[in-house]
Curated annotation (Swiss-Prot):
Residues 532-606 are annotated as: Helix-hairpin-helix (2HhH). Keywords: DNA damage, DNA recombination, DNA repair, Endonuclease, Hydrolase, Magnesium, Metal-binding, Nuclease, Nucleus. One of its GO terms (biological process) is double-strand break repair. Residues 89-152, 240-281 are annotated as: Disordered. This is Structure-specific endonuclease subunit MUS81. GO terms for molecular function: crossover junction DNA endonuclease activity; DNA binding; metal ion binding. It is an enzyme of class 3 (hydrolase). The gene is mus81. Its EC number is 3.1.22.-. It comes from Xenopus tropicalis (Western clawed frog). Residues 150-261 are annotated as: Winged helix domain (WHD). It comes from the Eukaryota. Part of the heterodimeric DNA structure-specific endonuclease complex MUS81-EME1. Part of the heterodimeric DNA structure-specific endonuclease complex MUS81-EME2. GO terms for cellular component: nucleus. Catalytic subunit of two functionally distinct, structure-specific, heterodimeric DNA endonucleases MUS81-EME1 and MUS81-EME2 that are involved in the maintenance of genome stability. Both endonucleases have essentially the same substrate specificity though MUS81-EME2 is more active than its MUS81-EME1 counterpart. Both cleave 3'-flaps and nicked Holliday junctions, and exhibit limited endonuclease activity with 5' flaps and nicked double-stranded DNAs. MUS81-EME2 which is active during the replication of DNA is more specifically involved in replication fork processing. The lineage of its organism: Eukaryota, Metazoa, Chordata, Craniata, Vertebrata.
Length: 612
């Protein structure tokens, strides 16, 4: 007899350690919303960012390290905090909401009984909380009828349903499958790995199983877990199998009409597995999406790039024909105190690590697969070994260096360049160096910067206490990567091809695609020659309020300054010039650029006399 059915439950969100700042931001957002001002969205983004961070803030200035906190909001918080101290006294705690507000809030919430359908939220007005369902829930359930959930073809949910269905038809079926069995059998039916995460994401194809359980298509019983189909899941899986068989007969894959896709599975998986990421039921949920994870959602389609693009490698390194080599940036061995710089190299040699010191244009450490070459009779020089770069790059930061890089802006720029370099496993190696209490930035702010890098940017963070421990970590990583890649055939690709190829590393695959090291290192050069479009983008981003997304939206319409100037010249009046860019759609939510920024840009490019 199967045991009791257990369904996945959402983890409780941690309480915000800065409720006073959250309260003030919420008041400002609501006030802006009443006046129909667009600043409400700015406050909403700041609220979302603040709620994701587990550390307390002592001033608005400290909040500047958070995403979506600019000079204006930080100054407003400091001014409001000063007023709060003047009203309540200098010793009043700021990490709790004042009792008067608390009592009022409690009185307003008194009629509401706890219900599993409603989730308390700091941003929900009291009158909305007194209802059983939130407005967003009503919109979903009211009006048109919901369509049946059908997983996308070759997604994690699709593969799991088909695998369980085929198991039920097997004469040796036990009526259930374990997690390991299910992952192994379902992998050939899925384009994503069931065990390894996608680039810049924390989720695997296995996370879709929680969606299947919630939709009552799969049941999970016992411990260790056993998975089997429900009647509803059996019926859906049978239809998927029939569509698959029909597609094979027709010579092309056929897809059952689906009302859902992998984005829905990803959103539900995020809310279950990440306690810091959740959808806001009051304001637009899309604002809550983390930029670090948005790449996968944008590229979701029924077929992955690897199916559409037939990659032909320039060369292939077969198992036994290459060595895994750690590359160390020469900056890590020169400059500063000689004994300190050489200590890392000494420790690596002591640990028996095969490494090479060279100029790296990005990161401090990375790993390559270097071809084994033999001397050719009659030639004086050994042929040059071909090299492929692995998907791991390490940026090493001592606490004092982290402090300096935050102050001069290098920290944000380095993270931006690491995201764009093409290597999908960026690692920040944070090394303690004495006491952080005497640095020019508070220790709590440095800790927030580290959390920010992991939670918002999606980088892996490794903390070490000294150089010796850092060398030990690099040694372990080198051994680990040697074990992974040494048994695989490595196919080369160029920098231009890397986004077209399926470069995911699957444990059961016999080969993987890697970028040539020479192309990668040249492409990562900081001061390489730039195109007119790149310089134009940098120029636009110097204007206050123009973010990378907004600059990219302008470049889609006007790729060069000449094309923008030509558009301005075709305008019949100064007012038309000022409004030329106001309707340009920006970002994931496709909001207008707005008349204020449009006017500022037009003044910059259309004013002939000196700007003052």
């Amino acid at each position: 007899m199967p045991g009791e059915i257990t369904y996945g439950r959402k983890r409780p969100l941690p309480a915000c350690p800065n409720p006073l700042f959250l309260k003030w931001l919420t008041e400002w957002r609501d006030s802006a919303a009443e006046k129909n001002l667009k600043t409400q969205f700015v406050y909403q983004k700041a609220i979302s960012s603040l709620k994701k961070y587990p550390l307390p803030l002592n001033s608005g200035k400290e909040a500047k390290i958070l995403q979506n906190f600019g000079d204006s909001i930080c100054k407003m918080l400091d001014d409001r905090l000063e007023k709060h101290y003047a009203e309540c006294g200098p010793n009043i705690p700021i990490h709790t909401v004042p009792s008067s507000s608390s009592t009022l809030r409690k009185a307003q919430r008194q009629p509401k009984a706890p219900s599993p359908l409603s989730i308390p939220h700091a941003l929900e007005p009291p009158e909305q909380e007194s209802q059983d369902l939130s407005p967003s829930k009503k919109k979903k359930t009211g009006g048109k009828k919901q369509r049946e959930y059908v997983p996308q073809r070759r997604s994690g949910g699709y593969a799991v349903l088909l695998t369980l269905y085929r198991d039920t038809k097997s004469p040796s079926s036990r009526g259930y499958m374990t997690k390991a069995e299910l992952q192994k059998e379902a992998q050939p039916l899925c384009d994503k790995s069931f065990t390894l995460t996608d680039p810049n994401s924390k989720y695997t194809a296995w996370t879709s199983v929680s969606t299947l359980i919630q939709k009552e298509l799969v049941i999970k019983t016992h411990s260790p877990a056993r998975y089997s189909l429900t009647e509803k899941g059996l019926e859906l899986a049978q239809r998927l199998e029939e569509a698959e068989d029909q597609g094979r007969a027709d010579g092309f894959p056929r897809q059952v009409q689906a009302s859902s896709n992998e984005e829905e599975e990803q959103e539900e998986a995020e809310s279950e597995t990440n306690p810091y990421i959740h959808a806001d039921p009051v304001q637009c949920p899309d604002q809550q999406l983390n930029l670090a994870y948005s790449h996968n959602a944008k590229n979701t389609s029924s077929d992955p790039p690897s199916v559409q693009y037939n990659h032909v490698p320039e060369f292939t390194l077969h198992p036994g024909d290459f060595n895994i080599l750690l590359c160390v940036d020469f900056i890590e061995t020169t400059g500063g105190a000689a004994h300190r710089k050489q200590e890392l190299v000494t420790e690596l040699r002591r640990n028996g690590v095969n490494f090479d010191v060279r100029k790296l244009h990005i990161g401090d450490f990375l790993w390559i697969a270097q071809e084994k070459v033999q001397p050719v009779p009659g030639q004086l020089r050994i042929p040059q070994a071909r090299e492929l770069v692995l998907d791991y790059v390490v940026e090493r930061k001592r606490m004092d260096d982290l402090c300096g890089s935050i102050i001069d802006g290098r920290f944000r720029e380095q993270k931006f360049r690491l995201k764009r370099c093409g290597l999908r496993r960026p690692i920040y190696l944070v090394e303690d160096h004495g006491s952080a209490q005497h640095l020019s930035i508070p220790e709590t702010t440095l800790q927030q910067a580290i959390v920010n890098t992991q939670v918002v940017d999606g980088f892996f963070i490794k903390r070490t206490k000294d150089v010796r421990e850092s060398a030990a970590y690099l040694t372990i990583m080198t051994r680990y990567l040697q074990g992974i890649y040494s048994r695989k055939s490595l196919l080369s690709c160029t920098k231009e091809e890397e986004w077209k190829c399926d470069r995911s590393l699957r444990p059961d695959a016999s080969s993987c695609i890697l970028v040539e090291f020479k192309d990668f290192n040249e492409g990562a050069m900081k001061n390489k020659a730039q195109t007119v479009k790149e310089v134009f983008a940098r120029q636009l981003m110097q204007i206050s309020g123009v973010s990378g997304e907004k600059a990219a939206a302008i470049l889609e319409k006007y790729s060069t300054p000449a094309s923008l100037m030509s558009a301005y010249e075709s305008c019949s009046s100064a007012e038309e010039k000022e409004k030329l860019l106001s309707s340009v759609k920006c970002g994931k939510l496709q909001r207008n650029l707005g008349p204020v920024l449009s006017k500022t840009i037009s003044q910059l490019y259309c004013t002939k006399e000196p700007l003052s």
